[in-house]
């Protein structure tokens, strides 16, 4: 009975019985079996992939076979493979994904793909084609025009993120453009004149994008924040010191400037005083370092442009004698590399820039040439392009983000055609593309690597932005899609009142009065009758002085110091005693009564006789 009860209870509770020994497992054997299964499965997967690759290599014609025939072949192959696999152990786990089976002939399951959909293989093929032909990567399918002013746009600056553009020109204005905040009207959100009446020559954001370097025609560079408020201003040097290294700042007009690519507080400027100076934003009282370019004879030469290398180790300057001089940033005395005959002497080299790789240097000369140099072999240029007119001392040249193209602008005279933006292949230096910008010179150009957009400054006050909706990012794409904002007019609904104007006192016509009554009324009006002001009684008031003697104190003061002076004639006062002197002589007359009874007076002599009696040496010589 006990065994039957135990068995029934065990069956009810779902286990075999009570008090039996637990089952033991051999873990090593189970691990070995699992490993063998995984190895066999991986072998089968590799064999299947190799077979698919061999089939695809041997029979490329399978792409042209109809899908029905391919489906039949796949069915037969699947049946044969199923028979082969049936002999082996069954696969354990989820089924292999369809993209790993290599069966590209199966029909697509699901809704049809959109018309613009491209497979990843097609995109890779297009990318390879673009790499082979860099012209296809130029974003020039669309453009927007920003109206800076009417004079030349001589400076362009774009922050590293590509959110804000800043432009400067010969009209002394600096304008700020925010792509995210602009609408289709394309209006600048701020305009200012940071350097008063000096032309703006260079604008550049720092590598962090929080401050802007402003270089104008004066001798003091300025640093502004993102909103245009001043942060610092460089000190001016002493122009009476001969050695420019002993002055604290520039003493002549600035020509250019740029930020250090690695150190966010350091920037550089070059000037007509013959120096290239480095500065620190935190110290505006003195420069950080000074570099003095020299001519072949050791004389002072003016640097017209300057730049840092991409790693910030070298400083390059284009000089007015046609030379290009490169210094090590830590050694300011002697040049690291130099080329004396880079451009024609006496011309202004307008731009010096390094490639993104850092080993190629491009220069835009005032002799209408564009040259590339290898700084490791700095004797001769790699390539030269001539016939590129340059009328401005700040005409730009820059590399494309992939270092395959070099772009620059050309200058034209008024009415002489369109200014062009030229694209040159860096390897062959052949002109591969050009853009006709406008009927004015192309001065500034900038190709932003993140936005993949090209900014151009022209000689007629325009700043153009070229972009491609498919290849470009943000930037001009953000503002062209926004509709122009309408001016909001303040409208208020108020209750309408009808007012008769002649009911008001000011519009009411006066009644006709007689002439006598009108004259009497005017007589009572002190203004119309011109009544004089009455004398002031007592102390003065209202700016008028009161009469003297009005009070006891004023009467006493007036009589304290009386004027006792005799205002009579002195001759009459003397002659008053003449009769008494004749009758009763007392002082002088008794002395002459015996010796000279008759009075003898002096003879009156004329002026002419006096001049005649003068000696010769006293006479005036006429």
Curated annotation (Swiss-Prot):
PROSITE patterns in UniProt: WD_REPEATS_1 (PS00678), WD_REPEATS_2 (PS50082), WD_REPEATS_REGION (PS50294)
Q: Where is this region: Disordered?
A: 37-141, 508-549, 602-622
Q: Which UniProt keywords apply?
A: Repeat, WD repeat
Residue ranges, compositional bias (Acidic residues): 120-132, 604-614
Q: Where are the WD repeats?
A: 148-187, 195-236, 249-289, 298-337, 344-383, 389-434, 437-476
Pfam family of the protein (one) = WD40
Compositional bias of type Basic and acidic residues: which residue ranges?
A: 37-55, 508-533
Superkingdom in the source lineage: Eukaryota
Give me the stretches of Low complexity compositional bias.
67-84
Bias class Gly residues marks the residues at 539-549
The reply on keyword Aminoacyl-tRNA synthetase is no
Q: Which family does it belong to?
A: Belongs to the WD repeat GAD-1 family.
- Protein name (Swiss-Prot/TrEMBL): WD repeat-containing protein 70
Record lineage? Eukaryota, Metazoa, Chordata, Craniata, Vertebrata
